[in-house]
Regions:
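Short, solvent-exposed loop/turn and secondary-structure capping segments
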Residues: 1-2, 17-18, 88-91
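Acidic/histidine-rich catalytic neighborhood
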Residues: 80-139
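A glycine-biased, small/acidic residue-tolerant capping/turn segment at secondary-structure junctions
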Residues: 93-103, 291-302
Length: 317
């Protein structure tokens, strides 16, 4: 049903957004109404991290039903989604060894478009999206797109410092940049936990997870962050940390008796991304993910204290 909304309602609007901005393909909107209008915001139109969602969701549909019917249903918009991604990356290319991603506000929204660049989640999701879009071309009997392969190869590596992945690189000299990195969404962990990992050092990510757990300003986080952290910890083989993340004692990790994920009293008394993140994390911790070596409950400690019962889950990408 969600992809039908993308296909039937949002795609014409997304095509116009890309065209208006001088890009090919479809630029999916971040904050929208049921009719795919862009919601008023000083942030939403500068976000990129929603762009590969269509590719991720289409891949989920193919995994559930790997058929020609599925390919024909979604291949066109997978292609056009990737066309924008490639065109945007080309606009960022300055001819160096690596292609940076610039001019966008990060999922970690305190990392603004004019403050930082090379945000880790966006870099990882861009690489994932273009890689999967190439698979779709091959499934459709097409040759790989050489431009996309060049971008995949040359996308900048995740920024790091002292063996810890960073929230981005400063656009200009900023004395308090490091302090700024420990607020808002811990998006750097999403680069490993939310999507299949590509070219990320698990040891460095483990150090990054430890730095987040000990230094983050939790009052600035949001309800879906805790599930994201748990999924990262699970992929790293840290089930105790995964549970700790789900149970972080902070206001925005509050669930009311009616199930709503309460955020603040003045706004967002319910927050469905928090519910979605919690449910996704629990399912992933039970069923695992592609390449996971443990057949059952990899996200829970093997200390004899957990007796899990579940059914109907599929492994996460």
């Amino acid at each position: 049903r969600m992809l039908r909304w993308y296909d039937d309602v949002a795609a014409p609007v997304a095509r116009n957004i890309a065209k208006r901005q001088g890009f090919k393909g479809l630029r999916w909107m971040k904050m929208t109404d049921p009719w795919a209008g862009e919601a008023p915001s000083n942030v939403g139109s500068f976000l990129l991290w929603q762009q590969p969602h269509y590719i991720y969701l289409a891949e989920e549909m193919y995994r559930a039903n790997p058929s020609d019917h599925t390919l024909k249903a979604y291949a066109e918009h997978v292609e056009q989604t990737a066309e924008f991604m490639a065109d945007f990356a080309k606009a960022c290319d300055r001819g160096g060894q690596y292609i940076p991603l610039t001019g966008a506000t990060a999922m970690q929204e305190c990392m603004r478009k004019d403050f930082s660049y090379n945000h880790p989640f966006e870099l990882s999701y861009w690489r994932y999206g273009l890689t999967v879009a190439q698979k779709w071309r091959e499934r459709m009997g097409k040759s790989r797109n050489a431009d996309w392969d060049n971008i995949i190869k040359r996308l900048a590596p995740l920024p790091e410092k002292n063996g810890i992945y960073q929230a981005g690189l400063p656009s200009k000299e900023e004395p308090r940049f490091d302090e700024h990195c420990y607020s808002d969404h811990p998006a750097v962990l999403g680069a490993f936990g939310l999507i299949p990992t590509q070219g990320i050092d698990s040891i460095k990510m483990r150090h990054t997870l430890d730095a987040v757990m000990h230094n983050w300003h939790w009052e600035t986080t949001w309800g879906w962050d805790y599930g994201m952290i748990a999924m990262t910890a699970a992929r790293l083989g840290e089930p105790e940390t995964a549970l700790q993340a789900l149970l972080i004692d902070t206001q925005k990790n509050t669930y009311l008796p009616n199930g709503h994920n309460f955020q603040t009293p003045d706004r967002l008394r319910l927050y469905l991304p928090g519910n979605g993140s919690l449910l996704t994390a629990i399912a992933m911790m039970c069923c695992g993910w592609d390449g996971c070596q443990q057949p059952l409950n990899p996200g829970f400690p093997k200390n004899g204290k957990w007796n899990m019962r579940w059914e109907g889950f599929n492994r996460m990408q």
